[in-house]
C-alpha cells in the first residue's frame, strides 16, 4: 500500500485567466496550466474548468485526492454555489460548481474566497511564521 502524500488539484479563477496547478506535500508537482477564462456562460466556464483539471490529471497520472480552488465572491463557499460575479457575466448566481466537479472527478471539491485563501497561505507559508519566530526570540508572548 502506498503512503504517498495526497495530490490536490487547484485553480485560481480570475476574470482573465484560469490558472491550474497540482500540489503534493506543499509543492507544485507538474507544469501549471493557464487557460483563458470563459466567462460568457456557465457551460463555457464549466467546460474550461473541466478541461484544465483534466489536463493536470492526465499529466500527473496519479490518483487525485481533492480539488481546491479560489473563486471571487459572492458565493456560498460551504456548498460550492457561485453567485453573481462582476468578472463572470455568464454566471447569474446559483451556479453549483462544487457539485458539478465532484460528479465529474469523483473526489471532494473545496471552494473558498481568493482573498481568504491568499491570507491563509501567507499565514502558513509566507512571512507570518518568520514574524512569529522573531517575536518568540524577543520574548514576546504574542503569536499570530
Q: What is each residue range found by the language model?
A:
Residues 16, 72-75:
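Short glycine-rich anion-binding loops that position phosphate/pyrophosphate groups of nucleotides
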Residues 49-67, 108-109:
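Phosphate/pyrophosphate-binding loops at sites that engage ATP/ADP/AMP, CoA/4′-phosphopantetheine
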Residues 2-47, 51, 58, 82-84:
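Short glycine-rich, Thr/Ser-proximal phosphate-binding strand/loop in the N-terminal lobe
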Residues 8-12, 64-68, 110, 136-137, ...:
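Short glycine-aspartate micro-motif
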Residues 23, 55, 100-104:
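Alpha-helical structural signal in soluble globular domains
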Residues 43, 76-143:
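Glycine-rich phosphate-binding loop and adjoining helix at the ATP-binding site
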